[in-house]
Structure formats: C-alpha cells, structure tokens
Amino acid sequence: MPRIPLEDNFTDVIGKAQRGLKLSDANLAEKAGLSRTDLAAIQGGEIRELALLAVARPLGLERNALLALARREWYPEQPLFKRSFAMFNTAFEDMTVNSYLVWDTKTRLAAAFDTGTSAQGMLDTLAGENLTLRYIFLTHTHDDHIADLDRLAETKAEIWNSELEPLGRLGAKTFQENAHFHLGELSIKTLFTWGHSPGQTTFYITGLSWPLAIVGDSLFASSMGGSATNYDMQLKNNRQKIMKLPLDTVLACGHGPLTTIKQERKHNPFFAHHA
C-alpha cells in the first residue's frame, strides 16, 4: 500500500481546537497576544513559528508537537503485523478513509471494522485467505465509513454498532460499553469514545502481533476527529480510554496512517502534554 499522508496539517489542528473551544478570532488573538494579522497568517497556512508557539497555549495544544507538525518533521513509524491484520484505504471525495479486517488463524473467522467506500479489497482478502466473516463492527455511522455496507452485509455476517448511535437497519445489533467479542484467540472489547459522533466506538483487540485499537475518527496521527459540540467530552474520552492503553498499542485510525500510543503521546498536539 502506498504511504498514506497525515489526515490533518497544523491549520486543521488549530481550527479543530478553536472551533471546539468556541473561540472567535478576536478572542483567540487576545488570549495568545497576537495581532489579527499574525493569527490570520497561521490560519492560512503560513509558518510563523512565534505565532504558532503563542497560539498553542490558549488552544490547549502542546507547542513543540504543533511546531513539528507545521515543519513536517514527523511521520509515524509503521508497525508490522506478521499475520491476521489487513488495512484498506479507499477514496472518498478529496480524501481517503480506512477500514480494517482481523482474523483468527486457527478458526479462520474474521471481523471487519467499517467498510470505507469500497469493500472489494476486503472481500478479496476474505476469499484469498479462506476466511469466514463473522462480524461487521462499525466505529460510527458517518457515510464515508459505511458506504459499502450493503455489499459487505451480503456475507451474512452480524452487524454491530453502539447503542448510542443505532444504525436503524433491519437485523443490525447494538452493544454497550465494555462488551466483549471473541474470534478464536482474539479478544475484542468496546470502548465508548464519543464526541466526534454520538456513538463513536474504539475496539481494543488482543491476540495479534500487537495490541490493536481501531479508533475510527476518535483520533488520527498528530490530530483527532473534529467536534464542534462535544469537544470537551471527546478530549476526555480520548485521554482516559485511548491514551492510557499500553504504549505498544497500534492505533488504526479512520483516516491517515497507522500510529501507536507511544508515538502519539509524544507527537500529537492534543495529547502530548498529557502523557
């Protein structure tokens, strides 16, 4: 798979934090001690380092991580799975979206996480690996994540998503937080990390080469999903339920590349200072 670019740049991170905190440009400029000209410049993508450092504090962002993102100094080291894990990256408008497949090597039972805009790669992997799809888990129900659900549902796999964001589809089932599912030696636990959407769910999986958290749009490498209405809860859920997972946990995000807890604790402007 070609290298997947980071989902967000530094202007996206600044914008998400500003909208989440409901700060007007005038408020933010005053809190940061910046002129409106300097603020407009960095919002427009100009790298003014002193202005970036100044704006980080009122936005609750870690200044060094924000500056490194602006300088494009970091890209997450990609973890390798020896087996039983596949990532699919499909186009959606002017961006891409990820979906995932895990399976147990003995029983050949598999679980899918979202569909992206095309489930063809996932279906090809199921056939090529001689797998039976047992579960289709949804991180949330935004269109880009479930666009090909009808086709994947033809496998007759069980469809599951959060009780906080019911799909409204005949036969779909809902889970509560801390629900447990099993595929042979694989264990899957649900964590409610809502904020980006009402039922945004993280799936924590053990039994693979590394602990794995499929986080949907809860967070991305160097960023997180946007939330203009539940920003505080999204930060709280991410900090308490995702960022406290073991350091070697691989984060499989809804957009952008894979990353790890260890890397995000150092490089994500939203979370680095809470490590």
Regions found by a protein language model. Name each.
Residues L61-Y75:
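Short C-terminal boundary/hinge segments that cap the last helix of small helical domains
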Residues I47, S118-S187, P211:
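Active-site HxH/HxHxD metal-binding segment of metal-dependent hydrolases
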Residues G20-D38:
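Short alpha-helical DNA-recognition segment
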